Amino acid sequence: MKRGEIYFHEYVDNMHRQRRIPVLVVSENVYNGNAPYATVVRLSRYNNNPCPQHVFVPGDAFEQPSQITDSFILCETVSSTKQASLVGPVSFLPDGYHMNKVCDGLKYQMGMIPMEAMRKETDAPAYSAAYRPNGWYSAAHSPQMRATEETEREEE
């Protein structure tokens, strides 16, 4: 597992359904107790995103970010629904820069995932972001976005 690679996080959601969520590895070989973990960015889905087709990520969100500048990530906005598509490449901002100043509503999600729960794929098509594993950190995760997610879950 290397920085900049796209993997799938495989897990079972609270409705006992199998999920495969594409993630971008930003730091590997993180140890939590005895189990190896990887720090990843969630590849989210969006529809009709007004953001530019270039994703800006704060440099302090990554370890040695220059190593993954040709990687791709997905973004979504607070008004997003389940549909989305791949955008990128990644640009890195100065440490501590708040990405909402670049694009209103743009958010990213970071989390730590056990390596054994991740499967390698050569490329990652866009998947639904309606179900998120517990424990994701989401910048700009507003009450409006949470309400949208709850509505989507109720509809399904």
Residue positions per predicted region:
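Compact nucleic-acid interaction/catalytic patches
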Residues: 8, 17-20, 25-61
